[in-house]
Regions:
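Gly/Ser/Thr-rich phosphate-binding loop
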Residues: 76, 93, 101-106, 115-176, ...
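Short Gly/Pro-enriched turn/cap motifs at secondary-structure boundaries
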Residues: 5-6, 172, 179-185
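Conserved S/T- and glycine-rich ATP-binding loop of Class I adenylate-forming
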Residues: 11, 17-20, 55, 61, ...
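Conserved AMP-binding
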Residues: 58-63, 136
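Conserved AMP-binding/adenylation subdomain of ANL enzymes
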Residues: 35-54, 62-103, 117
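Conserved adenylate-forming
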Residues: 2-9, 14-57, 77-79, 122
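Alpha-helix capping/helix-boundary segments
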Residues: 88, 109-111, 138
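Conserved beta-loop-beta connector loops within the AMP-binding
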Residues: 191-202
Length: 202
């Protein structure tokens, strides 16, 4: 069967979000938005091994963060995704040990719940090579405790649904200053403005 022709500017998905206003709205993302953000993530995660990574699919895929940084990035690298219908800390650590998970995308609460899991010491989590965190700020104490527990530094990032979603991330290898949202993704322009939208110096 021949595949249909798809224009890069055509609508690919509608992501619903409350955004910064709290008023629900559907963000229209094109095929270009989705593919480019996935490729930016692939470039950023240059230490990913094509066809040899195992992702923990614990973040919901109906959310732009889960869809792009877990599902799409896994598909782009030919990786296996271990799906969890809903997040439960002990089920997550069991899955990491059983399937030798190497990549985990999560939100701060997930990492915190894993740290606080009463049975976490029973499981070997050292297969994890990369942890990505988004959706809300990562507390420094959670970052430090998770690193002590697994030996892996969480790479915190920033994005918004309207951007498709990721715009910034800390380097996968290198400095991870606590509280930093990282550096702009490739070909991403960033600026600081005040409430009157005047550009400010960095």
């Amino acid at each position: 069967h021949s595949l249909p022709t798809v224009e890069s500017g055509a609508l690919a998905q509608i992501q619903y979000t409350g955004g910064t206003t709290g008023t629900p709205k559907g963000v229209m993302l094109t095929h270009r938005n989705v593919v480019v953000n996935t490729m930016q993530g692939r470039f950023w995660c240059s230490n990913f091994r094509e066809g040899n990574e195992v992702f923990l699919g614990a973040v919901p895929f109906f959310h732009c963060y889960g869809l792009n940084t877990c599902q799409n990035l896994a598909v782009a690298t030919g990786s296996l995704i271990i799906l969890l219908p809903r997040f439960h800390a002990e089920e997550a650590v069991k899955a990491i040990q059983r399937h030798r998970v190497t990549i985990m995308s999560g939100v701060p609460m997930m990492f915190s719940m894993m740290i606080d899991c009463p049975k976490v010491d029973r499981y070997d989590l050292h297969s994890i090579r990369v942890c990505l965190c988004g959706a809300s700020p990562l507390p420094a104490e959670v970052q430090q405790a998770f690193e002590r527990m697994t030996g892996v530094v969480i790479s915190e990032g920033y994005g918004l649904t309207e951007a498709g979603p990721t715009t910034h991330c800390n380097p996968i290898q290198g400095a991870h200053p606590p509280g930093s949202m990282g550096l702009p993704f490739p070909d991403t322009e960033a600026r600081i403005v005040d409430l009157e939208t005047r550009i400010r110096d960095v």
